[in-house]
């Protein structure tokens, strides 16, 4: 496949994980189009996205191989999109680490440590991490001003019990794991010295929750930043990456009124 000639289109929904796919596309140095979708007044995705993929979720990406008879391939789910784009377009970048140790190609156990970390992290983000994070955010909404004030004491009590007994202990375990991964990576990023698409996939959850962690329950003196210094330094590095900043600029160039969540 002549990947340099493939046509890539990102269906971008405001306040969604489509933003970190945009960052990935910037890092891959490929040409791509963006079609923008706005959320409805109830913050749901518009029905038009279901015309592209039956679930109507974001992000969505279409990839069309070169040739007059080629049909677009529709990619859905952040992890799958990230892996597909990295494998097809990332070989001249750092987005996907080298897979095989020299002389051990296609052998069991022949994979490099960097590639194993990359592959694992793609699944970790979509499995353990984002599910726990979303649970914390959704349960935390039971304490918000959106709940009628006369019900809020009850819903807050229930939310606090669930958060303290189950969600927060799990979340702390995940953050401690990421702290250890950074400590042992041999570089500034999860897979080593270079930024990869696994870092980009993880970035959305980390950046969006970094200032909200103390809402989910009690922490030792000093809070999350003291417990996970390497992780918070890592988040700051991600936010300072040129591609991260460029992804915001791209959307603002299209329409400065669009809401970006990260």
Where does each model-flagged region fall?
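Eukaryotic N-terminal targeting leaders
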Residues: 1-9, 251-262
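GST-like domain detector, emphasizing the conserved glutathione-binding G-site
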Residues: 2-161
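Residue-level signal for nonpolar/aromatic packing positions in well-ordered secondary structure
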Residues: 25, 61, 178, 199, ...
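A general structural signal marking secondary-structure boundaries and capping sites
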Residues: 89, 182-186, 242
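Short, hydrophobic secondary-structure boundary micro-motifs
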Residues: 93-99, 133, 188-192, 218, ...
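GST-like fold's C-terminal all-alpha helical module
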Residues: 121-236
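Charged/polar, low-hydrophobicity segments characteristic of intrinsically disordered regions
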Residues: 236-256
């Amino acid at each position: 496949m002549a990947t340099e000639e493939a046509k890539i289109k990102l269906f971008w929904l405001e306040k969604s994980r489509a933003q970190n796919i945009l960052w990935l596309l910037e890092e891959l140095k490929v040409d791509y189009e963006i079609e923008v979708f706005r959320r409805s007044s109830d913050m749901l995705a518009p029905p038009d996205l279901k015309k592209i993929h039956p679930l109507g979720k974001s992000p969505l990406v279409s990839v069309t191989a070169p040739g007059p008879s080629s049909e677009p391939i529709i990619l859905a789910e952040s992890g799958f999109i990230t892996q597909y784009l990295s494998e097809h377009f990332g070989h001249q970048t750092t987005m996907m680490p080298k897979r095989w140790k020299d002389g051990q190609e296609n052998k069991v156990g022949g994979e490099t440590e960097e590639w194993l970390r990359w592959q694992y992290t793609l699944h970790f983000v979509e499995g353990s991490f984002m599910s726990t994070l979303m649970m914390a955010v959704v349960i935390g909404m039971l304490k918000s001003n959106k709940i009628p004030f006369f019900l809020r004491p009850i819903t807050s009590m229930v939310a606090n019990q669930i958060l303290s007994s189950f969600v927060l202990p799990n979340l702390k375990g995940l953050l401690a794991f990421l702290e250890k991964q950074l400590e042992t990576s041999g570089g500034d990023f999860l897979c080593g010295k270079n930024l990869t698409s696994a870092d980009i996939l993880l970035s959305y959850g980390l950046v969006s929750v970094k200032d909200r962690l103390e809402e989910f329950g009690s922490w030792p003196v000093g809070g999350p930043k003291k417990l996970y210094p390497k992780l918070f330094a890592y988040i700051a590095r991600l936010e300072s990456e040129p591609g991260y900043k460029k992804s915001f600029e791209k959307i603002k160039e299209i329409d400065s009124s669009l809401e970006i969540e990260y």
